[in-house]
Amino acid sequence: MRTGKSHLSADGLEYVTQCNHLAPFLLTNLLLPRLAAAGTARVVNVSSIAAIRNGLIGWAPLDMDNINYAKDHSPQALMYAYHNSKLMNILFTY
């Protein structure tokens, strides 16, 4: 998890979200036909307890209107992006 200033990719997405969730999501979906053809393949997604910050157990909900925290310039913005990415891992798994 990084701290400091948020950085957006050329796609306009926060790097934390892109690396922690979108890249594994894309890779899994690209490999899914081959995994299904293999018959015994499994996909294992790894998340973090940090996901609870986002409402599964209590704290703030996932803010889809501010997914990159572009409106939030606080030092905590990257931490929130990390929490969101870990919640996205869980939601993708189920």
Name what the model sees in each region.
Residues M1-Y94:
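Rossmann-fold NAD(P)H-dependent dehydrogenase/reductase core
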